[in-house]
Amino acid sequence: QDLSEMPDLGAFYDRTPELDTLTTWILQQHCRLIALTGISGIGKTTLAVQLVQQIKDEFEYVIWWSLYPSPTLTEFQDKLIQFLSQSDNLDSPATNQKPLPLIKYLQKHRCLVVLDDIHSLFSSGELAGKYKPGYENYRSFFKQVEQLSHQSCFLLIGWEQSREIPQTNSQNTPIRTLKITGLDIPAAQEILRDYELAEIENYSALILRYQGNPLWLQTVATLIQELAGCEHEILLDDTILLPERLKNSLHQQLSRLSEIEKQVLSLLAQASEPIKRAKLLQNTLIPPSDLLNALQSLSRRSLIEQQADFYTMPLVVRQYVNSTFT
C-alpha cells in the first residue's frame, strides 16, 4: 500500500448511501473507472478515505496520490510502474526483468488507485474538463483504463472531471460518475452538535441555507461560536454569511471559470427564482450555443442546479457571485 498522501479521516458524517453505491460499483460490478465529483467542501475526499478504509483488504495494492501539482502522464506512469514493479521484485527477488507496461500490472494484480485533485490536470479559464497543454495524453490513458480488460479500479476525485467521462451512468459500461451533494439534515446536525449548536432554534433552516455542505456548515458554526452565539441574529432573516475560509474555498474553484461561465453565473445570480432555459436563451449578449455550453459546464462543476428546464444555484454561490463578479 501507498497511502502516504491520503488525508486523515477526521470527523465523518453519515454517507451510507454513497458508500454503498461506491462499494457495489467497485466490488460487485467491477467498474474500472469512477469519477467522484462535487462542489468544493462537499466531502468528496473524506468520503473516499472512508471508502478506502472499508474496502482496502479486497485489493492487493491500494495507492492514494494527489495530482497536485500536475505530474505529466509519463511521470505518473513511471511512478506507478516503479511502485508496482518493486512490489513484484520483493515477491520474486531472483528475477531481473524490465518493468512491464502499466496495463500489465493492472491485469496481473487487483489494484485500487485513488487520484485526488484530478482538476489539476485541466485548464483554468476554459469550460470544465479541458486538459492543460501537454496533458492531453491523460485522455487516452483513462480511455485505456476504461476499455482494456483488467481487474483494477481508478477512483478520480475533483471539482472537475474529464469531458469524456459521462455524467449519466450506464450498466453496460465499466465507468461511473457519482456527484456528491449535501448531507441530509440528521447527518448535518451532527456537525452542529460538534459545535454545540444542534439545539438552536431552526437549526434545519441553517442546514438548508448552506445546503448540507460540511465545510460551509463548519465555517459558519466556527464564526457563530467565536461571536458568542450570534445564531439568533443570523436566523432572523435570510442572511448568508461568507466567512473567509468559505470564500477562499469558493475562490479556488470559481477563479478557474471561463469568461462565458462568469457571465452566465452573474445572470443566474441576479434572479431570486429558478430561471427557465428559454428565458436565458433570449439574452442577446450571449450566443445560444455558448450559453448552452456554459450551462453544461457549470452543471458539471456543481455550481448550478437543473430541474427539468429550470436553472438555479446554491444560495451561498449566489451571494459570492453577487459580491465578487462585478
Please report, for each region that a protein language model flagged, where it lies by residue.
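Conserved catalytic network of the ASCE P-loop NTPase/AAA+ motor domain
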Residues: Q28, K104-K108, Q144-Q151, L257
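Short catalytic/ligand-binding loop motif for oxyanion handling, primarily in non-cytosolic enzymes
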Residues: G43, T72-L73, L121-S124, S162-P166, ...
